[in-house]
Amino acid sequence: METLKSNKARLEYLINDMRRERNDNDVLVMPSSFEDLWELYRGLANVRPALPVSDEYLAVQDAMLSDLNHQHVTDLKDLKPIKGDNIFVWQGDITTLKIDAIVNAANSRFLGCMQANHDCIDNIIHTKAGVQVRLDCAEIIRQQGRNEGVGKAKKTRGYNLPAKYIIHTVGPQIRRLPVSKMNQDLLAKCYLSCLKLADQHSLNHVAFCCISTGVFAFPQDEAAEIAVRTVESYLKETNSTLKVVFNVFTDKDLQLYKEALNRDAE
């Protein structure tokens, strides 16, 4: 049973456990600040392969992450819709949102970002949810026998996040402009696949990150238009009661989504 009382002590335990696993016997002076300890832990967790972990590790990790992740939670019930009763735009950290599901912009290997301390959404979601998500994703890939295709959607538990589930989708990667019709359609398919999966599992609400607009380089304005158009068409054509949150992080994306929703209303 997990008995460590502070998150700093938990971080030190997890760091030492992962270093032992790597046969890292170099002398390490533990950082004194929580922030530096977190960065060390996060980097090790990011690069750790999808291998089994001990019950003790999980207990310590879950106690720490659950505590940290529930300190600053935004509940969907506290948000006001921007259009109708079921479309929301919210600026903030998607990993703090209490909701049925959040959408993760994954890569085709489907194991989460394995670059230490990288600030992509895939890295942040996996880090804050816990190692179990990587293990679940690895099992999905093992069962299907191939990398994840662009435009599909798979569901895992949210584990230590306020969100109950994570829906993972691989968006198109843009290598040249203008964006091709094929890649526009693939991005729309990402949103459609996530919406269908949410309804298939009787979820009440889902929050989308800005799929493909980070390192995958989809232009933000085009992506916002496609996201809004696809979601609104789906809700109208299926009569779905699903509540949809467009989660944005930057001021630019916030403005783009507001403009896209206003244009669609004209």
Curated annotation (Swiss-Prot):
PANTHER family: GANGLIOSIDE INDUCED DIFFERENTIATION ASSOCIATED PROTEIN 2-RELATED, MACRO DOMAIN-CONTAINING PROTEIN. This is Protein-ADP-ribose hydrolase. Pfam families: Macro. Zn(2+) binds at C113, H118, C120. Monomer. Directly interacts with the lipoylated form of GcvH-L. Contains an N-terminal three-helix bundle motif with the Zn(2+) binding site. Belongs to the MacroD-type family. Zn-Macro subfamily. Its EC number is 3.2.1.-. Keywords: Glycosidase, Hydrolase, Metal-binding, Zinc. Residues 74-265 form the Macro domain. Its cofactor is Zn(2+). Binds 1 Zn(2+) ion per subunit. It comes from the Bacteria.
